């Protein structure tokens, strides 16, 4: 019985881990987002499978955008209370790589991500939560001005 539970736990753990990691890859997220954009962001035009993919796309990108915005707010607070130029430069550096301004239009965020992903296919196996997307797209398009 212990052996069976052990095998089952490995089986479920491995499939869950692979699914979670796969959805975080830029190429995978692009394949989830593009049909949603092609349907002009109308869920009713999508198959059930593509509706699920669209929700994964939207929640992932909005989550990243909101995290970057929260970081921007925190960095602004620290920047105002920084007492030397070295600290201020470090905070500006952090904001230029990881932070972003508030994203007001989620559809524009998805369109921008899709365009960025199409132009940066060399990053498709990288994770969306990594530096490349945050620095090269989010922090530039939605610049966090301290």
Identify the residue ranges that each predicted region occupies:
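Classical Sec-dependent N-terminal signal peptides that target proteins to the secretory pathway
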Residues: 1-19
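Generic hydrophobic secondary-structure signal
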Residues: 4-10, 57, 61-64, 134, ...
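Compact alpha-helical subdomains of small soluble proteins
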Residues: 21-22, 28-42, 68-146
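Short, well-structured alpha-helical interface segments that form or flank functional binding sites
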Residues: 24, 28, 51-59, 133
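N-terminal, post-signal-peptide region of Sec/Tat-exported proteins
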Residues: 44-75
């Amino acid at each position: 019985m212990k052996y069976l539970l052990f095998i089952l736990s490995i089986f479920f753990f491995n499939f869950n881990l692979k699914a979670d990691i796969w959805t975080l890859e830029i190429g995978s997220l692009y394949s989830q987002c593009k049909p949603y954009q092609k349907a002009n962001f109308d869920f009713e035009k999508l198959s059930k499978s593509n509706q699920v993919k669209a929700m994964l796309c939207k929640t992932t990108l909005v989550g990243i955008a909101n995290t970057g915005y929260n970081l921007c707010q925190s960095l602004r607070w620290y920047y105002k209370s920084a007492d030397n130029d070295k600290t201020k430069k470090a905070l500006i550096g952090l904001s230029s790589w990881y932070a972003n301004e508030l994203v007001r239009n989620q559809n524009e965020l998805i369109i921008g991500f899709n365009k960025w992903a199409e132009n940066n296919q060399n990053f498709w196996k990288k994770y969306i939560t990594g530096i490349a997307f945050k620095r090269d797209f989010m922090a530039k398009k939605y610049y966090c001005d301290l």
